[in-house]
Amino acid sequence: MLKALYCVFAIAPADAQTSFIPYAERSEFSLAAVGGLDTGLYGYANPALLNYVEGMENAFAWSTAPGRFAPSNQWGLFTALPHLGFGMIRQEGHGRATSEYRLGFSRGDRGFGIGLAAGWAGGETRFFERDSHFALGGFWRPSPRLSAGATLTSTFSLSEREGAFDLALRPFSSEHLTFFGDYASAITGAKDFWSAGAILELRPGIALTGRYFDNRTISLGLRFGLGAADLQTQSRFDQDGEYAFATYAIRLGSQQGNALHTLFPPQPRYLQLDLLGSIRHRRYAFFDKSQTLVELLTLIERARRDPAIKGIAINASGMRANPEMAWELREKLRQFRAYGKRIVVYIDRVDISGYHFASVADYLVLDPAGMIGLQGYLAGQTYFKGALDKLGIGFEEWRFFKYKSMAETYARDAMSDGEREQLQALLDDWYNLAREEISKDRSLQPAVFDHLVDDTTVFLPHEALNAGLVDRLARWHEIDAIIEELEVAPHTLISPTSYPRPMNRRWGARKKVAIVYALGVCAMDTGLHARTLVDDIAEACDEADAVVLRVDSPGGDVLPSDLVAAAVQKCRGQKPVVVSQGFVAASGGYMISMYGDAIVAAPNTITGSIGVIAGWAYNKGLKEKIGLSTDHVQVGRHADLPFGMALPLIGLNLPDRNLSNDEKKRMEHIIRALYADFVAKVASGRDKSIDEIEAIAQGRVWTGQRAVEIGLVDRLGGLEIAINIAKEKAGLPVDVNRAAPISLMRQVQIVVGALV
């Protein structure tokens, strides 16, 4: 009986062959029905399941004769990327061999997908009667409990066709227990096939399978996971319960649980972060190794939840991040530390902003040749009025609101009272934030911190050590030994590349929060690219369950600002929209924020600046000094207003004249009307009266800390807080963040847009 059963799965005589490998033989390498697994032999059995592939996956599988381990008559090789898979199965018999190849594609998401595969054969195709064919597949996973799938395999002539269906249930909505069944029927009349069984995952990386077949045989299988690798085996038993043969498989790819960690807990690990270079919101698809804020936040959160991670070691040498991003990372690290995990930070040369970030460490290491500068904060500008007067360029500032100061550097030779007042308030808030958090984390009295800033300012290494600003003087290459001293136990340092995200094995399309970035000046086709941004917001609103708009913009033109604000308002009527303000979200940057269901800002964010301003530069002798003259004809009383000398080599176009009194009155009317409209829209978006907004407008900028107090911002926090608020408003769980990959086409669009 044992030998007879093995022959059933060996290659039968040529007259029993089909033009493609039947479903029953394809499933021989699977521990379960196609739908009971995550990816269905990486698209070979059902190409639609390529939707579940998250990275490079490779597998080698083979069957053995009784009493043997080496491949016997059948083996397969499978490889896949997201939405793309290739596989082959080689079969041998009667001294001959053939190979069947399949290249598959998929579309859709994790809830519903379709796929198409093209198949062809090589080797002794005539003897085995193999032919080219195609396979259509689909699956439906409406929830984490249910999976249904179907495939149709056919020759291109449609002379031979086979349909297969599978159904799987996870009663606990997780991979811990799965029941499955499948059925295949050759439409051309071959014998039907069915099977049923279950998968029991005992611990991460250890799973048992059992499967009953229509011919009254059974298989028992084991999956032993090693993280990025799996060892799989199943043994087939005949109707009498005797061992018949076995199949084996080796998988290399995504993280799927490590049985060794279950049996033998690994050494405590420290995540090693090298923050050299710029930290950005986004990076280019190619040739850009920048780290992004959302990736770092997600990485730290994963490490916080991982019981094997005991701490983080950070090399902050050469770190470049704006103060708001640095604060967000600092807050995330503070949460990490609150879970009883250690943070070790290495610095070499830092100013007060860099030291503010680094002071979150439990143990702060300064390079023996390094330096700390606690110089405080300063804001100042260069004023060009005197130079413009000498050059013969006139400039008139159309300023009707006390704090709207964008153009004053051209119209004045010193800071206005309004500018001085608002900048001083910004610096005071920034300093108080740094003093409070540094003093708390370094166990200093605020008065002592003030003394260090005002009386010493710049600290050499031993001075910093004696002042309690750092805990040790050492180089980065000594950090491993330092951690060993701190932990008094063996540990392992791992890099982010050695700490990949585990594969998401949950069925069904997860609800999504889209992050849309509004970065740069408010302009139509540069800066934040308003034309494209409006479409991005609409697309995100259609496809996601909630939208987070990340704003980092100093403002700019009214038109693009208003277009984006209207897009946010429209989306808000359909889905929750939460605004996360970065370092600057002022003027037009605040306008595009105002319609959010909630606005989140960091305490050191610069926001507000609700106002409108303009200015006018004109010839006041420069043209004559350099020997130029202009002439013109016109129709229309004011047609000559923008006309003047042009210097194309330096891109200068300077109008010949200033505005007349009537023209100035008209311009003032326009600016005041735009301002009134701005104030009214902010009042509507923030659900406040016009008088309430007028009292805090006039073009004044505020820190995020003050903006919460006056009602321009709802909550202090960063991007992660905004995401969690969006999840709450959409009714989604807030405990898991998974960064959605950017499509290749979108990455190409970003690169091309940056080059044009």
What are these regions (language model features)?
Residues G36, G40, E57, A207, ...:
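Short active-site oxyanion
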Residues K191, A207-G210, S219-L222, L231-Q232, ...:
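Extended hydrophobic-aromatic, low-complexity segments
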Residues Q17-A249:
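Subset of outer-membrane beta-barrel
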Residues G699-R746, I750-V756:
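C-terminal structured "cap/appendage" subdomains that terminate the fold
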Residues A244-Q445, D450-V453, V458, A474, ...:
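Small-residue-centered hinge/linker elements
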Residues M1-A16:
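Sec-dependent N-terminal signal peptides of Gram-negative exported proteins
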Residues P446-N466, R472, D687-G717:
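Amphipathic alpha-helical substructures
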Residues H477-E484, I721-K727:
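A ligand-binding cleft/hinge motif common to bilobed small-molecule-binding domains
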